[in-house]
A protein has these predicted regions:
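Glycine-rich, flexible loop/turn motifs
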Residues: 3, 62, 71
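Extracytoplasmic cell-surface/polysaccharide-interacting catalytic and binding patches
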Residues: 1-47, 131-133
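N-terminal start-of-chain detector that recognizes signal peptides
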Residues: 25, 51-57, 86-91
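Extended, low-complexity, intrinsically disordered C-terminal regulatory tails
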Residues: 40-67
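Generic non-transmembrane alpha-helical segments
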Residues: 38-49, 91, 95-101
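Amphipathic alpha-helical interface surfaces
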Residues: 31, 35-38, 62, 78, ...
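Catalytic cores and adjacent binding grooves of peptidoglycan-active enzymes
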Residues: 71, 76, 80, 84-133
C-alpha cells in the first residue's frame, strides 16, 4: 500500500522478526502516514536522494525482540532509522539540522544510520533534538 510517492506501508512496517505480528493499529497507522509524509520532506531536503528505511514501526513484540525501550518512538510509528547511500549519517544529520524541517529527533547512531522522528502527536511542537551515539 502506497502511503506517499516514495514510501509504502510495507516498507515502514517491515521487520526481519517475521515470527511476530507487526501490524499497526489505527492510531499507529495514522502516525506511520505522518512519518511517510515527513520522510518525503526529508528526501526533498536531501536533494531527492533515495532513502533506505532500515526500521520504522515496531510492534511491542518486535520492539522487545530488538532490545529497544518501551518509550521508543518506533513503537508508535513516529520514528525511522534510515540510510542514504550517497551520504554519511553525519551529512544527513547536518542537512536535517540546517533545514526548516519539523523533526522531533535526529540522531546519528553508531555512524551507520540516522534515526529521525516526528512529534508523537500531530499538534505537538517538535523538540528538535540532535544527538550523536
Amino acid at each position: 500500500m502506497n502511503l506517499t510517492e516514495h514510501f509504502t506501508l510495507e516498507e515502514l512496517t517491515h521487520t526481519d522478526h517475521r515470527e511476530y505480528d507487526n501490524t499497526p493499529n489505527d492510531a499507529e497507522l495514522e502516525n506511520i502516514k505522518r512519518l511517510a509524509e515527513f520522510l518525503e520532506e526529508v528526501k526533498t531536503v536531501l536533494g531527492g536522494k533515495p532513502i533506505m528505511v532500515n526500521s520504522a514501526f515496531r510492534s511491542k513484540q518486535v520492539n522487545d525482540a530488538v532490545g529497544s525501550k518501551d518509550t521508543s518512538q518506533h513503537r508508535i510509528g513516529c520514528a525511522a532509522d534510515i540510510r542514504v547511500p550517497s551520504m554519511t549519517p553525519d551529512q544527513v544529520v547536518r542537512a536535517v539540522i540546517a533545514s526548516d524541517l519539523a523533526y522531533d529527533q535526529v540522531i546519528r547512531e553508531f555512524d551507520r544510520w540516522t534515526h529521525i522522528s516526528i512529534p508523537n502527536e500531530e499538534a505537538r511542537s517538535p523538540r528538535k533534538q540532535a544527538l550523536i551515539i
